[in-house]
A protein has these predicted regions:
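Segments that form or flank anion-binding pockets
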Residues: 1-203
């Protein structure tokens, strides 16, 4: 039965949403599962690994009564700037991720959909797909991809739409869900806001 979900956090907003999501998922599970067992609900979003071994060994969910050893999120973090991802990797949730799970650029997309979609998307496409493939290989029965992003910025909208197109072609058998954020058009500080919405929607 398909069950695992890989989360793609794209851009500043996507990674900030992801940070809150992982925090809430852990808190919610802890309130429902005080015995700290690695059950099927938790295995949808997390790996349970034993770090006493090198490389760490993946522990099976089994009958849902395996103790939690060390959780790793089923996620890929993507941003064309390093700031937000670096904050996440230094914060309280840092141990959920490792270097195999994130891709950052140095220049940013500058709120420019075209720069993100036409330059950064193709430039980072192979690396992104390789990281997604690595996460998929750790799944017993992958069900879907969930993308968290904003259409109010360059990376979230441009690279986000590029990734969706690429996944649709390379992995059409899996569901693609989006958690898309947009700010109010009337109060946006970026003059390219409305054209970016149109470009994202056209893809």
């Amino acid at each position: 039965m398909p069950r695992e979900i890989i989360t793609l956090q794209v851009g500043q907003c996507g990674n900030q949403l992801g940070c809150r999501f992982w925090d809430m998922a852990l808190r919610e599970h802890a309130s429902c599962n005080p015995n700290a067992l690695f059950d099927h609900a938790l295995s949808s979003f997390f790996h349970n690994v034993d770090r006493r071994y090198t490389p760490p060994q993946e522990l099976s969910v089994g009958a849902g009564n395996t103790p939690i050893r060390f959780l790793k999120a089923r996620a890929v973090l993507i941003d064309m700037e390093e700031g937000v991802v670096n904050q996440l990797l230094k914060g309280s949730l840092a141990e959920l991720f490792d270097s195999k799970q994130y891709i950052t650029g140095a220049s940013g997309s500058g709120n420019n959909w075209a720069q993100a979609h036409e330059v950064h998307g193709p430039q980072f496409s192979d690396a992104i797909l390789e990281k997604v493939r690595g996460e998929a290989e750790l799944c017993d029965s992958l069900q879907t991809f969930v993308m968290m992003h904003s259409i109010g910025g360059g990376t979230g909208s441009g690279v986000g739409s590029y990734i969706l197109e690429t996944l649709h072609v390379s992995a059409p058998e899996y569901l693609e869900l989006q958690s898309t954020t947009q700010n109010q058009v009337l109060y946006s500080w970026a003059i390219v806001r409305v054209p970016r919405l149109i470009l994202f929607g056209s893809e």
